[in-house]
Amino acid sequence: MASSTVSVVLSLFLLLLTQANSANIQSFSFKNFNSPSFILQGDATVSSGKLQLTKVKENGIPTPSSLGRAFYSSPIQIYDKSTGAVASWATSFTVKISAPSKASFADGIAFALVPVGSEPRRNGGYLGVFDSDVYNNSAQTVAVEFDTFSNSGWDPSMKHIGIDVNSIKSIATVSWDLANGENAEILITYNAATSLLVASLVHPSRRTSYILSERVDITNELPEYVSVGFSATTGLSEGYIETHDVLSWSFASKLPDDSTAEPLDLASYLVRNVL
């Protein structure tokens, strides 16, 4: 998968949205971040045009026990209770995770859809997104995690990408070899026609790519309106720390006029033609 694939596919998605009925489209794109566009929680800040999710000392060294979240300031409607229509959506972002030690990392970053007004959850291995490794529908949260530390209670025994539904215990995972201090280009899509959530990650410097997918019925797992954004945490001790910077971010969704309208089939297109 070429390093430009993420941006090319998102551009295609935006074009499809534009050519479709312009109603019910929600989209935004940031190459430089500014605070008024975001709800910042915990240690998250906007610094030099990037989202810096976890705390960093003046010397550039990350701090332990840091938690930061950043969500787009406007709610996103992902389905319509009155019509039964469900939105297809895609998001693309570039992140960089850097750790002082090449041997120890913690804990990771997640892209999350959470209830509007949600507050940070537990620190450390819970990534600030969940409180438990037991499924709890009242959490009303779906996330894709990029987990740099294996917690023995619920994680596989390696760094991994995971899809989380109302629990920090992932319903699907794939092993991931983090490129320390290098950019990762990430694309996540949701296909309303198939309920398929697809996540892909590329390290352009290594020409390595990872892909993960799982079916998720978001009408059963999420509220009608959500906040979309990021959450990240560092480990609880000095030996397990890392930075979490979001360098760019785009998001687009299309909610059909009714439940019978044909949704965008982007996820299937990716699997067949790109990934």
Swiss-Prot record:
<keyword id="KW-0732">Signal</keyword>
<protein>
    <recommendedName>
        <fullName>Seed lectin subunit I</fullName>
    </recommendedName>
</protein>
<keyword id="KW-0430">Lectin</keyword>
<dbReference type="InterPro" id="IPR001220">
    <property type="entry name" value="Legume_lectin_dom"/>
</dbReference>
<dbReference type="Pfam" id="PF00139">
    <property type="entry name" value="Lectin_legB"/>
</dbReference>
<dbReference type="GO" id="GO:0005537">
    <property type="term" value="F:D-mannose binding"/>
</dbReference>
<dbReference type="InterPro" id="IPR016363">
    <property type="entry name" value="L-lectin"/>
</dbReference>
<keyword id="KW-0106">Calcium</keyword>
<comment type="subunit">
    <text>Homotetramer.</text>
</comment>
<keyword id="KW-0325">Glycoprotein</keyword>
<comment type="function">
    <text>Metalloglycoprotein, containing Ca, Mg, Mn, and Zn and the carbohydrates galactose, glucosamine, mannose, and fucose. It agglutinates erythrocytes of blood group A1. Has a high preference for GalNAc over Gal.</text>
</comment>
<keyword id="KW-0465">Mannose-binding</keyword>
<dbReference type="InterPro" id="IPR000985">
    <property type="entry name" value="Lectin_LegA_CS"/>
</dbReference>
<dbReference type="InterPro" id="IPR013320">
    <property type="entry name" value="ConA-like_dom_sf"/>
</dbReference>
<feature type="signal peptide">
    <location>
        <begin position="1"/>
        <end position="22"/>
    </location>
</feature>
<feature type="glycosylation site" description="N-linked (GlcNAc...) asparagine">
    <location>
        <position position="136"/>
    </location>
</feature>
<dbReference type="InterPro" id="IPR019825">
    <property type="entry name" value="Lectin_legB_Mn/Ca_BS"/>
</dbReference>
<feature type="site" description="Cleavage">
    <location>
        <begin position="265"/>
        <end position="266"/>
    </location>
</feature>
<comment type="similarity">
    <text>Belongs to the leguminous lectin family.</text>
</comment>
<dbReference type="InterPro" id="IPR050258">
    <property type="entry name" value="Leguminous_Lectin"/>
</dbReference>
